[in-house]
């Protein structure tokens, strides 16, 4: 519909937090170039970075949107996937309401049945909640569009209902529900640590801890010989690396350049969804490939 992306970059050195001053600089440059910036998208916990934004950072973002009159779109589909000790997910809705910003910020929050510990991707369930300073005419238009669309699939509606209203203490299935939930999340945490440790043991690789979501997003420092070769062949370094990794090991990753990483840096996104036993094999294959790659360009 003619929209234009204005990128901003997370601060990798500060656990992939949002640098609001940097975001403001990007906004001002876009406006100076004639772009009418209308909204900002925040993903928390992060994809592809696996970070969890602090309450302080979320409040900074909410105030920034209030000051700049930007619609705040908060993608929170990984809210159940939090693994870092002492950290918990806080919704942007809570941040906005607790700070008394609901008259200054229009917030759209998104959640899904595809992630979390339930992972019901094929059910196609999810919802959007509108909070705060929305123009009533805009809300009416959104409701009209929803009303004339086809009804959401029944299975998706059922799963959304179950996610929003899980078993409660005293109900027959409560103990089993808690055990299955806790076992799944504990296993994901162990897999996250195992894969992150394997990546950090590789030469030229730095992988920040995955506080949440389902991903590791390691930083790659490539040998200069390899960089020169890619430049000569007009190839993107992280794309070429991921392609070779796929062809030689069968491991599927996504180049960081596909996500709009900071210029001059290279990453790839990988998931720790395979079973704990399979993750060990992934780590071995990845290690062998990378060591061979480094040896080739030394």
Predicted regions and their residues:
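PLP-dependent class I/II
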Residues: 1-298
